[in-house]
């Protein structure tokens, strides 16, 4: 693990695998952050649902939001599986021996965080909808509106900067080229050549 980044490098993290024993498992701080945001949304949802009306169309709209949330969570599992098959482990911050730039990573350097941001927006839209059709709770409404912004700022200003530093240290030339051609959150940059 490097002091500057706090992330284990692929070779050091995989040494225990070569010695025959598994590497000690730990959850990445970003997993804990994602879980915290999800739990906050569940609390807001339960609070809003408990005090709101339950007309059939309200339930149908809430079910649609629920379906979108299931797609978001399933998408994150698929992205983590994609990264895992290429030698990295997003759950424990094991950096792959080769920089992953294919699949969704060709369009976003952080597709899991992007999908989690979409998930936050869907959760917030559900809470706002329930607030509009039920009794208004200003604190719940304010939290629903602020949580996606808090997630974005925390990841953009803190988490992703640390991860970029770790990836740059592990793959200096490849990451420099990759970050010039693919946006931090989304999109290929203009004039960028394929990796």
Regions found by a protein language model. Name each.
Residues 110-111:
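Histidine-centered phosphotransfer motif of kinases
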Residues 1-105, 114-195:
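Membrane-anchoring alpha-helices and their flanking helix-loop junctions
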């Amino acid at each position: 693990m490097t002091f500057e980044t706090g992330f284990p490098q692929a070779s050091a993290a995989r040494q225990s695998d070569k010695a025959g024993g598994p590497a000690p498992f730990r959850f990445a701080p970003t997993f804990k952050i994602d879980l915290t945001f999800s739990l906050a949304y569940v609390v807001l949802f339960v609070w809003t649902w408990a005090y709101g009306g339950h007309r059939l169309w309200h339930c149908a709209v809430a079910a649609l939001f629920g379906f979108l949330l299931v797609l978001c969570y399933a998408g994150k599992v698929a992205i983590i599986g994609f990264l895992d098959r290429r030698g990295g482990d997003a759950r424990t911050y094991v950096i792959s021996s080769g920089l992953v730039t294919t699949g969704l990573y060709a369009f976003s350097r952080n597709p899991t965080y992007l999908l989690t941001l979409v998930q936050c927006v869907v959760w917030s839209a559900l809470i706002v909808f329930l607030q509009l059709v039920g009794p208004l709770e200003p604190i719940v409404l304010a939290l629903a509106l602020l949580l996606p912004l808090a997630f974005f700022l925390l990841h953009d200003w803190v988490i992703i900067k640390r991860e970029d530093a770790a990836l740059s240290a592990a793959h200096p030339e490849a990451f420099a080229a990759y970050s010039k051609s693919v946006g931090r959150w989304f999109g290929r940059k203009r004039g960028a050549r394929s990796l």
